[in-house]
């Protein structure tokens, strides 16, 4: 009593406390970063190694395997996957979520150092690593185009000037340049001219390397002057290399220009980028973990004038994709929902209490509780994102509950003629324990969620903490500010202006009287009520089993990714044309705003596209509907497939795939894997629950297989290393020298001229000069024939692996898809030597699916324990928890009605319902117990009176929670697919539970009271 009086009788102190909470919240709000979802930093490290010209199998056996053995010993590695393709190996290490990324990076560096001695000596550089976050998509993509500058020059400007400046922008972590490669001097050899002059390819390489060196020449100290010695030991342009003497033939010099075409070009001619139908260089910008996306994008945009001024005017620098507009729009929609929810909740209070002054009290309490939460969010390192703002929207219905319970009880005393100060003290004392029980038991629901491991736990931690803090602040406000305002603002016997809306009071009274009659019947027919309750429990089980399930709602971020997979033997020139054709088809769709793409590099038959859709206000279709529409048009393109998927803010796993979900086949025997992968892929492609089924197993690439005649080689004085060097020099785009410039370093690249690299018959023109100076054609000691070879070799752990990727058809669910895949594997009879397992998002979904029921049970158990402690009873918590089955039925039926799958968002809605619907029972049980202890009446009479007495606050709090969630159900625009499942679950659960628990709770109370009387004759204890 004294505690409450302290705040009621000291209005200035209470007001200043409220202002302090509000001001701290406003400051916290201004400092909070902005992002689409809570930051989940998966500790992922990518190791890269290169050996230009090496085939995938060589890269896998000589580079990937030694590295995997060393890296596999690192503690905390959850998954290790590798892809070896032409000249490169990429290894992805995914660590435990709790592993420190910096410590993991040190371990990776140590492992790379240990493996260095096991790697081939021909590697141009040591393996490197970088940290990465697979779930963090680029925040911006820029393009450089020009009618006058070459692609190499554009790439040079992009990497040397623009990327450096952009990377220095606050919030930017990495800028990747693609679509071409750095400028280089290319030496395109003519095999016929070399043969005629008697010059070997390796002699040309050695001559170029020896002619371009950078070594210190020292200095000279004269008597009065210090002289630096500088020689023209470097050649920096193609023009400088052309007259270089590479050989003497009968005393006459053979110059490089006599046997080769020397041009200024690029390091890798098999790289191409496109934007808006013309060649382009791409700048892909990523943010730092936890950085404010909107602020970072704004900073980059502010730098655009300076960036454009730093490059020639004939180069166009444009933004092809910007992630911030959809984030801004989505957060604006959530904030709008929050404001609407607050307004609706306050309207509920006004309708029921019919007093402007009384309505003012929750109108102050609700914003203060919500605003104060921002301070705690900032201190916890959270961000303003869809989930944290959804938590505040839902919290609107929760935080007003405490104020409503206190306000309604005080108003009841005022209506009875009690003076305001006395009514405030008496009213808050009567319901103080009730409010405390409601708040603590509601927060207890989130304890299992806070302890949940893995991605879901990290993802919803902000949601749970934000909601819990809002409830905690609301508890403080409802027990301090609310009674103080009641004492100083409200009056006994309110009259006057409320007469005009008194009609609603009559309606409410009539409803209450009707409820009293129906409750009286229910208490007289308890068996029928119990049948209904047991039926809801059974219906819960059936609905949960039958409802389609998915991991996370399919988002429409306004961005799509396209992955091209062409015939494995396709040439680079044909691949460029495929990219252009696909970009034209996609760009012609009315919902598409821009398309940017690139192809080349180590994957010769693949390409990628970044697609931006028009804002939702300018298109009628969702991203998934656009994909479905384009799928039919894209299927008509021969020789290649384009797989489209909507970019999601949540992505799990570091492996590259052409679709959203992955199923990986593992085998110790590569032959068994190659035998069964096509069978499994064909079976999965027939499943209607899957779409865009494809595989990363590409073992049908065209290869010219050479067989050396070692006896002939020994007789001719040629060893295998010389023959291999010949092929590498001719076809490997071999980097043979480095050109040092003030801002960058460039390469001298040697291979045969393009007309020879595009025709396998050029092998007939290759030759080696043996130790006797004789020119020996390759055909003298080698035979070759066409064969198939892998374009990539994939490992998971130390096993050969092949990943089958798939998307979901429009309206499909992940649970149906995974179940169909498992059935197909069983029906195929795949041997035990070939193992299948879901990977990435599909794997996390299956793990989450197994833990969902345990999570719900843990939440119920936690609430039971908390209520048992609060009520000093084993039985009364069960009475309160009997409200849950009806809420579950309502939530699941609502999801079925709206054709929404059961996702993690819906699971959170169920968790919230556990906390919400028990409030009704708490209010009933509290007053019934108090009446039994102090009024000396029967349990039936006590629960009947409590139900009628608390009918108005029960209806008010339920409607407040319902209206708080209603804006989420009715939301549209960006991010609605995240908000709607939560709102649907809560509204459906509230409606059904409100109808049933008004009857089931009193009946359960009676049953347990009879049970208590049967086993114990002691009267109820009075709890102080």
Swiss-Prot record:
Any one Gene Ontology molecular-function term assigned to this protein's record: xenobiotic transmembrane transporter activity
Question: What's the chief localization of this chain?
Answer: membrane
Disulfide cross-links: none
Which Pfam family, any one of them, does this sequence belong to? ACR_tran
Protein topology in the membrane: Multi-pass membrane protein
Q: Does the record carry Transmembrane helix as a key word?
A: yes
Subcellular location, record wording: Cell inner membrane
**What does the UniProt keyword field contain?**
Cell inner membrane, Cell membrane, Membrane, Transmembrane, Transmembrane helix, Transport
Q: How does it assemble?
A: Part of a tripartite efflux system composed of MdtA, MdtB and MdtC. MdtC forms a heteromultimer with MdtB.
Q: Which PANTHER family does the record cross-reference, listed alphabetically? A: MULTIDRUG RESISTANCE PROTEIN MDTC (PTHR32063:SF34), PTHR32063
Annotated protein name in UniProt = Multidrug resistance protein MdtC
- Recorded source organism is Yersinia pseudotuberculosis serotype O:1b (strain IP 31758)
Traced from the root, the source organism's taxonomic lineage reads: Bacteria, Pseudomonadati, Pseudomonadota, Gammaproteobacteria, Enterobacterales
Q: Which gene encodes it?
A: mdtC
